Regions:
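Short S/T/G/P-rich N-terminal loop/turn motif that feeds into the first structured element of a domain
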Residues: 1-89
Length: 89
């Protein structure tokens, strides 16, 4: 299962981190397991999520046009587009 990393900005890093459990469920629903949250150490609002993607193409499709419940979760967590997606090769 290839590793996948998604980076993006957030409105507030601490608020984003407070939703860790909820985000893990939402990310798992898109096909990413063992998700790990990462926050930039430079004080910026840049974050990343890393995990194992069973079907990277399906995950990328889900993120390109997220279902309403995923979009609502992203908004509640303060996600700021664009999302950059990296896949282990």
């Amino acid at each position: 299962m290839p590793k996948m990393v998604v980076t993006h900005g957030v409105v507030d890093v601490e608020k984003w981190l407070s939703f860790k459990a909820e985000r893990a469920e939402a990310v798992a629903a898109t096909g990413v397991l063992n998700a790990v949250d990462l926050a930039a150490q430079d004080g910026s609002n840049a974050v990343a999520i890393m995990g194992d993607a069973d079907d990277p193409a399906a995950v990328m499709a889900a993120l390109a046009s997220p279902p309403p419940e995923v979009a609502a979760t992203m908004e509640r967590h303060g996600v700021v587009p664009p999302l950059m997606i990296y896949i282990e090769k």
